[in-house]
C-alpha cells in the first residue's frame, strides 16, 4: 500500500515538474519574442526635421518607448497637419521605422499679417518652424472686393500661374517670390531676378508664362532691354507692354 502511495506521489511530483517546465518554456518564449524599442527613425521628410515630427507626436523621450505599439506610433505621427500618412514597421532589432508622406505644399499664404501654408488640395496649414519656405511663392492680398466672392477662385488663379510658370521654366519658378492677387483682380508678380513687378492677367496663363520665359532668358544672357523699366504688363492677349520710367522717357 505504501509502495503504491510513493509511486503515486512520485508521479504527481513528476507531472508538476513537467507542467512547471512547460509553463516556463512558454512564458520564456513569449518574453523573448517581445519587441523592444529604443529608437524611432523618421524618413522621407522634407518640410520638417525628423525630431520635430517626433516632438509634435510626443515621442521625443526614448525612455517611454517600452510599452508602445506600432499602431500607437502610427496614430501619433499621423496627427501632424503636414502629413498624409505614415508607414510604420519594426526593424527586428530595436528600432521603429517610420516612413512619412507629406502633403504637397503649393504656396505660402499671407493673411492678416500671418503666414500660413497652402496645399494643392486648398487646405490651409499652420506654419511650424523651422519649415523651409524659401522657394515657395507667397500669395497675398487674397480677399475679394465682393463680399460673396469666394477666395477659392483667387487661390485657383494663383495656382494656375504657379503651374504655368513651373511648366515653362523651373528657374523662373524658383525665383517667383510673390503673387499679389489684388483682391480678385489681375495679379502682380514679384521675382527675385526682376527689379520690377509683372502684371499678370487672368486667362491664357500658359502662353503668358512662355512670354515671361523668353524675357527671363534675355535677362539671363545679359541682354537687358528692361534696365529702366517700371513694370511688365502681360494682361493682354498677344501683347506685352513695357512701362518705362519717366526719367527715361524724358531723356529721349
Locate each region found by the language model.
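Extracytoplasmic/luminal low-complexity segments enriched in Pro/Gly and acidic/polar residues
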Residues: 203-252
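Extracytoplasmic segments of membrane-associated envelope/inner-membrane machinery
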Residues: 99-178
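Terminal hydrophobic membrane-targeting helix
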Residues: 27-131
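Flexible glycine-/small-residue-rich
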Residues: 44-46, 100-104, 140-143, 181, ...
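Extracytoplasmic
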Residues: 37, 48, 91-95, 112-113, ...
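Short beta-strands and strand-coil junctions in structured, solvent-facing domains, enriched
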Residues: 63-64, 84-85, 95, 104-108, ...
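Hydrophobic membrane-insertion alpha-helices, especially the h-region
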Residues: 9-27
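Periplasmic/extracytosolic POTRA-like scaffold domains at the N-termini of outer-membrane
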Residues: 44-81, 133-160, 200-206, 210, ...
Amino acid at each position: 500500500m505504501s509502495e503504491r502511495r510513493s509511486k503515486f506521489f512520485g508521479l504527481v511530483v513528476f507531472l508538476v515538474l513537467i507542467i512547471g517546465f512547460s509553463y516556463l518554456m512558454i512564458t520564456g518564449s513569449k518574453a523573448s519574442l517581445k519587441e523592444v524599442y529604443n529608437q524611432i527613425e523618421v524618413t522621407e521628410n522634407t518640410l520638417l526635421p525628423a525630431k520635430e515630427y517626433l516632438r509634435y507626436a510626443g515621442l521625443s523621450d526614448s525612455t517611454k518607448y517600452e510599452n508602445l505599439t506600432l499602431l500607437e506610433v502610427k496614430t501619433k505621427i499621423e496627427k501632424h497637419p503636414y502629413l498624409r500618412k505614415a508607414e510604420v514597421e519594426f526593424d527586428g532589432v530595436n528600432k521603429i521605422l517610420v516612413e512619412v508622406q507629406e502633403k504637397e505644399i503649393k504656396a505660402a499664404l499671407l493673411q492678416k499679417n500671418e503666414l500660413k501654408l497652402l496645399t494643392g488640395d486648398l487646405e490651409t496649414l499652420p506654419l511650424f518652424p523651422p519649415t523651409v519656405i524659401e522657394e515657395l511663392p507667397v500669395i497675398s492680398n487674397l480677399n475679394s472686393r465682393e463680399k460673396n466672392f469666394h477666395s477659392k477662385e483667387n487661390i485657383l488663379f494663383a495656382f494656375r500661374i504657379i503651374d504655368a510658370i513651373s511648366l515653362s521654366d523651373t528657374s523662373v519658378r524658383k525665383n517667383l517670390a510673390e503673387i499679389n492677387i489684388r483682391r480678385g483682380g489681375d495679379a502682380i508678380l514679384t521675382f527675385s531676378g526682376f527689379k520690377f513687378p509683372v502684371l499678370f492677367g487672368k486667362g491664357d496663363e500658359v502662353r503668358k508664362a512662355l512670354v515671361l520665359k523668353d524675357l527671363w532668358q534675355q535677362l539671363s544672357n545679359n541682354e537687358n532691354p528692361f534696365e529702366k523699366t517700371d513694370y511688365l504688363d502681360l494682361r493682354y492677349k498677344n501683347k506685352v507692354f513695357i512701362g518705362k520710367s519717366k526719367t527715361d522717357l524724358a531723356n529721349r
